[in-house]
């Protein structure tokens, strides 16, 4: 809108140049008419020149108003197209970001489920091993007890030693299973690694969505700037060219009117005949509207 307003002002300056030339022609024609008798050819000439000048000025004003409106409409259309581009980019970004976020969330949830399943499997395996070893130790103790009951107290010590060895071995195996589950690189660490990888993947996905949004915003701003600058500069250049043409045409009309008045003005009844340089400055003959294009 700022560029359209500037273009309208440039066109108005061209109208002002024509208006000044036409006003000067009207004033000169009226002055010549006042020096001549009423109803003479000079008076008619002055009135007709004034009417043509007024008509030409009105046409110029209408043309300038129409061109200013056209420039404003072009600028408004460019701005609306840029806004539509921005809206489409925002909608695309939202849809893309939503899909990316959902995919990242699914990957995180899958990693968590995998880690949970691995930990539960390790826990179940440790419990099963401990239960098996406990059953074996109980069976060995019962066997030893039966041996003692059958063979007497002389083998009690041997049975105790055997049972102690079996229990010690079972306890050692259970401790090894527990250490393997909690040691570096074990099941717990693997579950933690899966969880960390899932979180990193989600962070990368969100960062990519943010970068895409910034690129769309830059493209939208560039589209607005290009559309507005192109429409405004073209209209302003046309208005400035018309302004220069108006000034040149006004000067030519003044010289032509001065020459015609000095050469063709009729002699008044009292013998007065305007000489070159004494007639209206910038007046125009019939049929030549001042400033009309």
From Swiss-Prot:
Repeat positions for LEA 11-mer repeat: 58-68, 83-93, 123-133, 134-144, 145-155, 160-170, 171-181, 199-209, 210-220
Protein's organism: Ramazzottius varieornatus
Cell location: Mitochondrion
Compositionally biased tracts (Gly residues): 279-293
Record: transit peptide: 1-31
Sequence similarity: Belongs to the LEA type 4 family.
Main location per the UniProt record: mitochondrion
Main function: Mitochondrial heat soluble protein acting as a molecular shield in water-deficient condition.
Comment text on domains: Contiguous repeats of the 11-mer LEA motif is characteristic of group 3 LEA proteins and form an amphipathic helical structure under water-deficient conditions.
Sequence ranges of Low complexity compositional bias: 27-43, 230-265
GO cellular component assignments: mitochondrion
Annotated stretches, region: Disordered: 27-52, 217-293
Annotated keywords: Mitochondrion, Repeat, Stress response, Transit peptide
Name under which the protein is recorded: Group 3 late-embryogenesis abundant protein, mitochondrial
Other observations noted: Improves osmotic tolerance of human cells.
């Amino acid at each position: 809108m700022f560029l359209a307003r500037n273009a309208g002002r440039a066109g108005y300056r061209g109208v002002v140049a024509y208006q000044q030339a036409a006003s000067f022609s009207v004033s000169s024609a009226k002055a010549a008419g006042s020096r001549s008798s009423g109803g003479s050819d000079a008076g008619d000439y002055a009135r007709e020149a004034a009417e043509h000048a007024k008509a030409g000025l009105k046409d110029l004003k209408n043309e300038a108003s129409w061109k200013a409106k056209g420039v404003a409409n072009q600028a408004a259309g460019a701005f609306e197209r840029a806004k539509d581009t921005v809206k489409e980019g925002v909608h695309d970004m939202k849809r893309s970001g939503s899909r990316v976020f959902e995919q990242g969330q699914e990957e995180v949830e899958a990693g968590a489920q995998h880690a949970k399943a691995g930990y539960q499997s390790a826990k179940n395996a440790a419990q099963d091993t401990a239960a098996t070893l406990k059953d074996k130790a109980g069976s060995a103790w019962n066997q030893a007890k039966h041996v003692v009951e059958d063979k007497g107290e002389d083998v009690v010590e041997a049975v105790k030693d055997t049972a102690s060895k079996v229990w010690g071995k079972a306890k050692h195996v259970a401790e090894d299973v527990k250490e393997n589950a909690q040691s570096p690189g074990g099941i717990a660490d693997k579950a933690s690694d899966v969880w960390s990888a899932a979180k990193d993947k989600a962070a990368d996905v969100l960062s990519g969505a943010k970068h895409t949004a910034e690129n769309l915003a830059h493209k939208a701003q560039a589209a607005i700037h290009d559309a507005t600058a192109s429409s405004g500069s073209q209209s302003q250049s046309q208005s400035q060219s018309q302004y220069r043409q108006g000034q040149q045409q006004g000067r030519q009309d003044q010289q032509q009117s001065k020459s015609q008045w000095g050469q063709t003005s009729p002699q008044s009844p009292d013998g007065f005949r305007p000489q070159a340089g004494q007639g209206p400055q910038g007046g125009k003959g019939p049929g030549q509207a001042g400033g009309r294009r």
